[in-house]
Amino acid sequence: MNVGVAHSEVNPNTRVMNSRGIWLAYIILVGLLHVVLLSIPFFSIPVVWTLTNVIHNLVMYVFLHTVKGTPFETPDQGKARLLTHWEQMDYGLQFTSSRKFLSISPIVLYLLASFYTKYDAAHFLINTASLLSVLLPKLPQFHGVRLFGINKY
């Protein structure tokens, strides 16, 4: 074990989702969020599933698609300061296993939420809007695109 030795990555954001156990931790955190929401007595099952989906997608959108730069003092801060975490992930390569996992997980959660809400129209619209808001920025066509100048700087 090398104590005090710096990591070899110039920008740790590029490889964080490929770390050991990160996918399992992600799934456990989503499950924990769902259990915490289930423990609130006045929420029905459909409301809990919709809230789990919406909170998950909101957190994913904020952390992957709005926060830019790196949380570390890195030599490449000049390059990474204008890129979101999603754009930095896997050095910008598309269709890597981490990107596929983070694209499929909201879809799976959406399908579960739709099933457990029994396809109720109000829940369905909320869950669909939430899914689209988090899936569209992940498309390769939106890499580096800032709609209406939002989050440009």
Swiss-Prot record:
Transmembrane segments: 22-42, 43-63, 106-126
Major localisation: endoplasmic reticulum
Alphabetic keyword roster: Endoplasmic reticulum, Membrane, Transmembrane, Transmembrane helix
Domain of life, source organism: Eukaryota
Cell compartment(s), UniProt: Endoplasmic reticulum membrane
Membrane topology: Multi-pass membrane protein
Gene Ontology cellular-component terms listed: endoplasmic reticulum; endoplasmic reticulum membrane; serine palmitoyltransferase complex
Cytoplasmic topological domain: 1-21, 64-105
A single GO BP: intracellular sphingolipid homeostasis
Parts of the chain on the Extracellular side: 127-153
Entries under InterPro entries matching the protein: ORMDL (IPR007203)
Function: Plays an essential role in the homeostatic regulation of sphingolipid de novo biosynthesis by modulating the activity of the serine palmitoyltransferase (SPT) in response to ceramide levels. When complexed to SPT, the binding of ceramides to its N-terminus stabilizes a conformation that block SPT substrate entry, hence preventing SPT catalytic activity. Through this mechanism, maintains ceramide levels at sufficient concentrations for the production of complex sphingolipids, but which prevents the accumulation of ceramides to levels that trigger apoptosis.
Free-text note on domains in this protein's UniProt record: Ceramides bind to ORMDL3 N-terminus and stabilize it in a conformation that physically restricts the accessibility of the substrates to their binding sites in the serine palmitoyltransferase (SPT) complex, hence inhibiting SPT catalytic activity. In the absence of ceramides, the N-terminus is flexible and permits substrate binding, thus liberating SPT from inhibition.
Family: Belongs to the ORM family.
Subunit structure: Ceramide-sensitive subunit of the serine palmitoyltransferase (SPT) complex, which is also composed of SPTLC1, SPTLC2/3 and SPTSSA/B.
The protein's name in its UniProt record: ORM1-like protein 2
Organism field: Bos taurus (Bovine)
Lineage per the UniProt record: Eukaryota, Metazoa, Chordata, Craniata, Vertebrata
